[in-house]
Amino acid sequence: MGRIYFATTNLKKLKEIRSLFEADIVHMNIPMVEIQASLERIVDHKLNQVVPCIGEGDAVIVDDTAVAFEGLYGFPGVYIKDFLRIGSRKISEIVGKIGNSNATAFCCLGIAHYRDGRVVKKVFFGELEGSIVESKEDGLEGFDYIFLPSGSSMCLGDMPVDEKNRISHRRIASKKLADYMASVGIIKAHGS
């Protein structure tokens, strides 16, 4: 098997993905155009942009995330990156005024690889139930510091990496992806 790439401009995500897989993940630093669509269509569009960069035997992984606030009927969803521009403290305030802090974090991981000379694309989802809590400070990167997983006493961003990697939405999606990769010979099966 060739190389396994993770296409992202986010070095924090790259580090997290590398910690989730028992394989050598090569960084593919390619800015991608993000369309406004469903999580699955966004990931498929990203895959279409990076497939020309890989060769026979290689694989490339992309990802996207969404956060659905129950009190806002699923908003911001895939627009979470734009919504975060107002700051984590403001998001906490908005959710507090609505009176329903329930939220679901979603991760969609996509993989493209060649099989018998043809590109094969697959997507895998992970979701994590939780709630939005008051921000300790503003300007924190991402939603991890205001997202409290159900049954946890710590926000995702406050957890030690190994604990976060056991429960996160990205972990759930990456487990499904790793199982697929092992089933088609991209990586060795766990324990092999």
From Swiss-Prot:
**How does the annotation summarize its subunit structure?**
Homodimer.
Tell me, in one coarse class, where this protein mainly resides: cytoplasm
Q: Pfam families annotated for this entry?
A: Ham1p_like
- Signal peptide range in chain numbering: none
Q: Which family does it belong to?
A: Belongs to the HAM1 NTPase family.
Q: What does this protein do?
A: Pyrophosphatase that hydrolyzes non-canonical purine nucleotides such as inosine triphosphate (ITP), deoxyinosine triphosphate (dITP) or xanthosine 5'-triphosphate (XTP) to their respective monophosphate derivatives. The enzyme does not distinguish between the deoxy- and ribose forms. Probably excludes non-canonical purines from RNA and DNA precursor pools, thus preventing their incorporation into RNA and DNA and avoiding chromosomal lesions.
UniProt catalytic activity: ITP + H2O = IMP + diphosphate + H(+); dITP + H2O = dIMP + diphosphate + H(+); XTP + H2O = XMP + diphosphate + H(+)
What Gene3D superfamilies does its record include? 3.90.950.10
Q: Which cofactor does it need?
A: Mg(2+); Mn(2+)
Q: Which GO terms describe its biological process?
A: deoxyribonucleoside triphosphate catabolic process; nucleotide metabolic process
Enumerate the InterPro entries for this protein.
Answer: ITPase (IPR027502), ITPase-like_fam (IPR029001), RdgB/HAM1 (IPR002637)
The protein's GO terms of the molecular function aspect are: dITP diphosphatase activity; ITP diphosphatase activity; metal ion binding; nucleotide binding; XTP diphosphatase activity
Its organism's taxonomic lineage begins at: Eukaryota, Fungi, Fungi incertae sedis, Microsporidia, Unikaryonidae
Query: What's the name of the protein?
Result: Inosine triphosphate pyrophosphatase
Give its E.C. classification number: 3.6.1.66
Subcellular compartments? Cytoplasm; Nucleus
Residues holding Mg(2+): 34
SUPFAM superfamilies of this UniProt entry?
Answer: ITPase-like (SSF52972)
Q: Which organism is it from?
A: Encephalitozoon cuniculi (strain GB-M1)
Cofactor: how and how many bound: Binds 1 divalent metal cation per subunit; can use either Mg(2+) or Mn(2+).
